[in-house]
Amino acid sequence: MIREERLLKVLKAPHISEKSTMVAEKQNTIVFKIAVDATKAEVKAAVAKLFEVEVETVRTLNMKGKTKRSGARVGRRSDWKKAYVTLKAGQDIDFMGAAE
């Protein structure tokens, strides 16, 4: 069993993009930004516990930070990790309802 403090640190935020919106509508999949050291099992447990839904699958991938310039200076954004969480049929996460 994963400690509750760890579950709260695994999920950072929902990742909102054109692709994530299409995937959410067609395949009942939610995309999250997650901690770089998080595992699939931790993500599955965190989503199930925090949103009270049943998770079918979790796919994770590491995103490389982009190189950015500001004048002559060249910098790099941090690497980050995201997870595609597919929910079982009939399950749904309502982010707007949770904000009220």
Curated annotation (Swiss-Prot):
Membrane-spanning intervals of the chain: none
Gene Ontology molecular function: rRNA binding; structural constituent of ribosome
GO annotation, cellular component aspect: ribonucleoprotein complex; ribosome
Annotated GO biological process: translation
Superkingdom as given in the UniProt entry: Bacteria
Annotated disulfide bonds: none
Keywords of this entry: Ribonucleoprotein, Ribosomal protein, RNA-binding, rRNA-binding
HAMAP family: Ribosomal_uL23_B
Family, similarity comment: Belongs to the universal ribosomal protein uL23 family.
Quaternary structure and partners: Part of the 50S ribosomal subunit. Contacts protein L29, and trigger factor when it is bound to the ribosome.
NCBIfam families according to UniProt: PRK05738.1-1 (NF004358), PRK05738.1-3 (NF004359), PRK05738.2-4 (NF004363), PRK05738.3-2 (NF004366)
Protein's job: One of the early assembly proteins it binds 23S rRNA. One of the proteins that surrounds the polypeptide exit tunnel on the outside of the ribosome. Forms the main docking site for trigger factor binding to the ribosome.
Name of the protein this chain belongs to: Large ribosomal subunit protein uL23
UniProt organism field: Aeromonas salmonicida (strain A449)
